[in-house]
Curated annotation (Swiss-Prot):
Family, as annotated: Belongs to the dUTPase family.
NCBIfam families in the record: dut, PRK00601.1
Record bears the keyword rRNA-binding: no
Enzyme class: hydrolase
Lineage per the UniProt record: Viruses, Varidnaviria, Bamfordvirae, Preplasmiviricota, Tectiliviricetes
Catalytic activity: dUTP + H2O = dUMP + diphosphate + H(+)
UniProt cross-references to Gene3D superfamilies, sorted A to Z: 2.70.40.10
Cofactor: Mg(2+)
Domain of life: Viruses
Source species of the chain: Avian adenovirus 8 (strain ATCC A-2A)
Function (record text): This enzyme is involved in nucleotide metabolism: it produces dUMP, the immediate precursor of thymidine nucleotides and it decreases the intracellular concentration of dUTP so that uracil cannot be incorporated into DNA.
Functional pathway: Pyrimidine metabolism; dUMP biosynthesis; dUMP from dCTP (dUTP route): step 2/2
GO MF entry, a single one: dUTP diphosphatase activity
Protein name: Deoxyuridine 5'-triphosphate nucleotidohydrolase
Single biological process term from Gene Ontology: dUMP biosynthetic process
Amino acid sequence: MSFDSGCPPTPPVKLLFKKHSPFAVTPQRATSGAAGYDLCSSADVVVPPKSRSLIPTDLSFQFPRGVYGRIAPRSGLAVKFFIDVGAGVIDSDYRGIVSVLLFNFSDHNFNVRRGDRIAQLILERHLTPDLEERSGLDETARGAAGFGSTGGFDTGVCPSSFS
């Protein structure tokens, strides 16, 4: 079965990157269905307990038009070692070397070795609309109700597996 959208084929989109040292590792997707490209450390770094460290990749990127890069955590590092990622937006006009801010929430040093996969780069489309200030906004059923306002864990929608 084939799908014909009726539109002319779009040219392939490319993510351009530059290696700034022989220790930079080409980003790769672990599987064909992976959303992100794995980013690897270009140096040995220790992330102290309850602290953070900036991990170099020695890579810079040129994103397709209308796209920015988001640095996201790797789930295995979070689950096994309490490692998370911070400050994860790479603007489309940034051409400098990308580093990854790792937070260590554990009580032990986290040793990053050169070549270790430390995060993933996910490409996301973005809009930059013109701003228009208004004295009021359209009303909604939710209104200004904030954190936790849409319900807790006991919604009755999903059966509990903890009983």
